[in-house]
Structure formats: structure tokens, C-alpha cells
From Swiss-Prot:
Organism: Blochmanniella floridana
Entry-linked Pfam families: Ribosomal_L9_C, Ribosomal_L9_N
GO biological process, one term: translation
Family designation: Belongs to the bacterial ribosomal protein bL9 family.
An annotated Gene Ontology molecular function: structural constituent of ribosome
Descriptive protein name: Large ribosomal subunit protein bL9
Function: Binds to the 23S rRNA.
Gene3D superfamilies in alphabetical order: Ribosomal protein L9, C-terminal domain, Ribosomal protein L9, N-terminal domain
Amino acid sequence: MKVILLDSIDKVGKIGSEIIVKSGYARNFLFPKSKAVLSTKKNLAIFKKQQHILKSNLDSKRLKAEFRAKAINDLGSITITVKSSIHGKLFGSIGSRDIAKLITESVGFEVHKSQIRLPNRDALKSIGEHNVCIHVYNEIYANLTVHILNSVLFQDKSKKS
């Protein structure tokens, strides 16, 4: 199915591109989210008339995303205290939902869990520093350091009476 993209989409195309996609992808994703229209002569003419409006909307989204990325980068790091073993392994794990919630509380705008890119695409399971990437918009990313600390100090077993 031939469509005209109304928004830039990673690994698919840029705004205004006339591309061929599978019909299910177009019907189930692109059309409902208003990211593309069917490529016809009429739609092509309408798109050419409204192209400057769409590009200005895209520019405003990009500026907003750059502002958000700067705010997250300025945050620098967040600290999480959790229970862990003597060896530094967490009782549980820190996932993208936990990190997104802390970032949202810190910066004042919503960061969704799907925007968080964890190292090795797995939850954080040990004490220490972990570098996390946040996908803000198409090619705009922010970096953040997550410090995980132990909340319980374990006593040495030899001191028990």
C-alpha cells in the first residue's frame, strides 16, 4: 500500500515521503495515529498545500523535545535506595517504570516507561551506577546516571551472641 507520511517515523521515513508499506501496518498503526494518508492524486495535492504547516508543527515538536532532553540532561543523575544482599544484588529489580516515575517527579513533565532505554535491555539488578538513555523524540536522546544504593545496613553475623 502506498502512503504519504505526515510525520517522521524511525526506520520508516521522513515527513512527506511517499513509501510502500504493508496494508496492515498502514491500517492498524499509521492511519489511526494520523501519521500517514493513502497516496492518491487528491491527497498528494492537499499534502503539498499543507506541507509548510506540517513542517512547522514538526519543528515545534522538535523544539519541545530538545527542551525536555536538556532538562533531563541537566538533572544528571537520580538516586534510588533499595534493599539488597551483602554482595550487592537487589531484592527485586529497578525497571523502566520506576525510573520513569522518578524522572517525572524530578523534572515536572511526564516521561513514559517506553522512552527509557536500559543497559542490556534488562532491569537493573545490582547496586552501583548505571547509565540510562531516554528516547525523547525521533533522533533526540538524553542521558542519565542512576545511582542505586543499599537502604539496609547488614550486621556482621560474627557479632551475634
